[in-house]
């Protein structure tokens, strides 16, 4: 998948990410812009999770929504 496809996917799914993690701000979602590591980092930051817990949440979200980076 190229960068444009990933960016398009993210635009489609960022509302679902906001529903899942309501503490993420619009600025957070802009910074994340389809980058998995950024999503994990922002979840850690906003929710005080360890990296492993944030990774697990993101993995569950990816599986549930069939999201591909």
UniProtKB/Swiss-Prot annotation:
Pfam family, one: CsbD
SUPFAM superfamilies the UniProt entry points to: Hypothetical protein YjbJ (SSF69047)
Signal peptide positions (record): none
Family that this chain belongs to: Belongs to the UPF0337 (CsbD) family.
Name under which the protein is recorded: UPF0337 protein ECA0631
Annotated source species: Pectobacterium atrosepticum (strain SCRI 1043 / ATCC BAA-672) (Erwinia carotovora subsp. atroseptica)
């Amino acid at each position: 998948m190229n960068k444009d496809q990933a960016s398009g996917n993210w635009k489609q799914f960022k509302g679902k990410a906001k529903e899942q993690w309501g503490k993420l701000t619009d600025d957070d979602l802009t910074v994340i812009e389809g980058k998995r590591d950024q999503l994990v980092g922002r979840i850690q930051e906003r929710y005080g999770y360890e990296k492993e817990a944030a990774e697990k949440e993101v993995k569950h979200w990816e599986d549930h929504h069939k999201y591909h980076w």
